Amino acid sequence: MKRLAVLCGALALDSCGLQPMYAGGGNGIVAHALADVSVPVIAGQQGWLVRNALIDRLGTSGQSSARYRLDVRLDDKLEGLGLLGNDTIARERRTLRARYQLVDSQDGKILLDATAGSDAGVDVVSSEYATIAAEQTALENLARVVADQIVAKVSLRLRSGGSTASQ
């Protein structure tokens, strides 16, 4: 009975057109489209981290002759939380937000206009070096998370082949 239910479920999924986004692996439609996205230089250390993470995930070299261009603007905030009795900060929150646009390089049309972001908590300890290292690690992790979010939305847009901006 279970086998029959699984078979019926598989047939139902097949008939609705559901398929993996990365069907075809490196030779699939999405992989080819992602490899044709250039990522211009993004200002600052956080920009360098996000751009490198995007290039790694897109499978591109950041070439300028690509069909699509991904313009990214970042907002990186570090704010103190949790004041102790002696007015020192016990915890910080690092927030990295990205506003990005996927632009068709051929006609300048904006295909996707969206945001991505994440935040991380950092404990402030008595060692200044340890706190700085924790802040840096948080930034590196946030850059990867934001890049993953951007690539997921760009992949969906390129897979759908839409030609209008969406959020």
Protein language model features and the residues they cover:
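Bacterial Sec signal peptide processing site at the extreme N-terminus
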Residues: 10-33
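N-terminal export leaders
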Residues: 1-8
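Surface-exposed short loop/turn segments
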Residues: 61-67, 71-115, 121-137
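Acidic/histidine-rich, surface-exposed loop or edge segments in extracytoplasmic proteins
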Residues: 31-42, 127-130
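C-terminal/domain-edge helix-coil "capping" segments
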Residues: 133-167
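Solvent-exposed, acidic/flexible segments
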Residues: 43, 47, 51, 91-92, ...
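Post-signal-peptide N-terminal segment of Sec-exported extracytoplasmic proteins
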Residues: 36-69
